[in-house]
């Protein structure tokens, strides 16, 4: 049995065992999603609070827990009818004891849509049946798990993405069926022990997100779930996070075609991520980030987990650099935010892959100047309108930034980037607005991206992170967006009526439009209108 499935099975056993026993919690655990997280903006980004906001997912406790309970209990209907209570107010199964809580929900996600612009005019649909369970024991143990069985027909551009990457975006391996149908499973599990108000340990099959933006140039929640152990420490104004991850990349080749066919991979990789966040005051926060990725096997043979990286200190670079022939991929980064107004926060990131001072400031397009930048602003109650939240963001990455000399040790997980979905060699501007009123939720998103892709002969232009940086054609004269020029315009609008906020059961209607103009090629155009009965808080990234 795969480690992730074994872990999930053990967690589900614990859930049932404790949930049905006779055992009011003060903490909650839930996967991260932007659309849910933005509802906490007035607490997270208020100049009256001093919370660590950039390491996600985080536990809901104290004022966040109060807000969580408020959001999931709002608009209760007064009814003694069991069906009406379960439909509008309660979890399907709910246990609230003095020192523990337990809940279980069925999560339907049914959607049907129609392609209005693309020439194939296909009917799109999603048929998902899921379960979620949550358990707390006093204020020490928190557990969350979900499982989804899915079939779907996607728009053309997502169909093409899955054909190349062999995954549903952010949700793992996909099986191709007839007539464009896809079949896949998706699961999440997270078990946290809270030693005190200062230290937490989490074992999870989930994702992580470092940053205050919608995207992250450091570590994002875009790729599929992976098994990891996370330590979080909070002392005064300092929060420290250390993550040790076991990841899969089954698509990666097992042989190095550039080195006489030497073996360098078995589809397994490891990662260590450290993040140190310091709240200077109520308005300013600064964080330091570093990561290292290594293959489970390389030319020297089986390696497994490297215990040199078990050191929880934020000093991985010296450890890695002591090995002059290190096959590991290393990154360092900076994350910062400043609450410029009562209801607006500016944020940013800087990622550094390689640095040579002479070349970095030389302005000569040196290929090994590998960096990425994010700048953004987000806020709440825009124009004095209660619950009108917003975000505007700019992201850029130099060519070759996330590549490595072999793809198994690049900055990816299960065939997708660990940072920005576009990989590298791009500029991107995006904006998101969310508004909630009574039981209604509205969202509007727009994205513009200019990026370069590889030509037909496969020359490495720096955007495809699965290429080897040993195949860089020109060491100098490189620029962002080089290669085949692409211009992407994406817009998405949704309106939903929330039936049950406990598990986000909602009636939803939406329209998604995507135009991609490719140099000297026919433009790719798509416009899909959809309606559905949806639930859960999981993210699905189709905006790429």
Report the location of each language-model feature.
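Exposed, low-structure sequence patches enriched in small/polar residues
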Residues: 3, 184, 279, 284-544
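Bacterial Sec-dependent N-terminal signal peptides
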Residues: 1-30
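Residue-level marker of intrinsically disordered, low-complexity segments enriched
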Residues: 14, 22-25, 105, 146, ...
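Outer-membrane beta-barrel channel domains
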Residues: 27-298, 362-371, 378-396, 401-404, ...
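Short regulatory "switch" loops immediately downstream of catalytic or recognition motifs
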Residues: 1, 14, 247-250, 449-452
